[in-house]
Every structure is written in structure tokens, then in C-alpha cells.
Regions:
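Pair of pore-lining "gating" transmembrane helices in MFS-fold secondary transporters
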Residues: 6-37
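Small-residue-rich segments within alpha-helical transmembrane domains of MFS-like 12-TM solute carriers
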Residues: 21, 25, 99, 115-123
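Extracellular/periplasmic helix-loop-helix junction of adjacent transmembrane segments
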Residues: 34-65
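MFS transmembrane alpha-helix packing/gate-lining sites
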Residues: 59-67, 117, 148
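Conserved MFS/SLC helix-loop-helix module at the cytosolic interface between two early adjacent transmembrane helices
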Residues: 66-102
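Paired small-residue
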Residues: 94, 105-113
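Cytoplasmic helix-loop-helix junction between adjacent transmembrane helices
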Residues: 110-149
Length: 151
């Protein structure tokens, strides 16, 4: 792989990381309003709305925690690129389901799917970046990965 091709892959991975984290971060401020609206539509007890907000906020990273090791093992077996693509497709599905949710149950399903699939994107992308960069440039590329994730 030549230098230009390698740089294009690095930029694409960094952009993917940025978009996934942007999608996660954009939803968080609207999640309480969205949850309240769906809870009231489902005629749920208003005292439980805050419980659902907390659970919907935490269920996403909880499923990321559960599945990150699974994705890591699968990426070692099947390769990095297919699992990054699968994770990004799952991320798109999660965002569509979240936007189209008409009940709290659908929102829970969307958040669980999001946690499962996005847990592949960050660690597998970092492993892929590590695979395609030289030891000399690896620290710099990993720093850029951190920037993409935290931006």
C-alpha cells in the first residue's frame, strides 16, 4: 500500500471515529426530552421518567462494555475492515431506529443495538490504525485518534 492510500485510510478511519462520537454526543442532550415525550405517550408513571432517562443513558455504554471484547476477538479472526463496516452499519441503524422510535421499547432497542455495534468501531479502528502505521508514526496517529474520539 502506498503512502497516499495509507493516508486516505487513516483519514477515513479518523472521520468515522469522529462521526460515531458526534452521533453519540448529539443525542445525549435531547434524550431526556425524547424519553419524556415517549413515556407520556405510553402513559407511563411520570415519577419513572427520570429512571428511564438514566437507564437509556447508561444502557448504551453498558452494552459497549459487554461486547467490546467480543468484537476484538472477531476482528482478530475475520479482519479489521469488515468489523468496522459492520459497526458503522449498526450505528446507522441505531440512529434510524432512535429517530423513528414511537415507544420507549423501540428507544431501548435502538440504544442496545447502538451499544453493541458501536463497541466495535473505536477499538477495532484503533487496532486497524496500529496495523497500518509504522512504529515511528503510531504515537502520532493514536493521538489523532484520541482527538477524533473526544472532539
Amino acid at each position: 500500500m502506498n503512502r497516499k492510500e495509507k493516508l486516505n485510510r487513516i483519514y477515513l478511519i479518523l472521520l468515522s471515529l469522529f462521526v460515531v462520537m458526534l452521533g453519540y454526543g448529539i443525542l445525549l442532550p435531547t434524550l431526556p426530552y425524547y424519553t419524556e415525550r415517549l413515556a407520556l405517550k405510553d402513559n407511563l408513571d411520570t415519577n419513572l421518567i427520570n429512571f428511564h432517562i438514566g437507564l437509556l443513558t447508561s444502557i448504551y455504554p453498558f452494552f459497549q462494555l459487554l461486547f467490546v471484547v467480543v468484537w476484538g476477538k472477531l476482528s482478530d479472526k475475520y479482519g479489521r475492515k469488515p468489523l468496522i463496516v459492520i459497526g458503522l452499519i449498526g450505528f446507522v441503524v441505531m440512529n434510524l431506529l432512535t429517530g423513528l422510535a414511537t415507544s420507549l421499547t423501540m428507544l431501548y432497542i435502538a440504544r442496545i443495538i447502538g451499544g453493541i455495534f458501536t463497541s466495535s468501531v473505536i477499538p477495532v479502528s484503533n487496532a486497524y490504525l496500529s496495523d497500518i502505521t509504522s512504529e515511528k508514526r503510531r504515537t502520532k496517529i493514536m493521538a489523532w485518534s484520541g482527538v477524533a474520539i473526544s472532539s
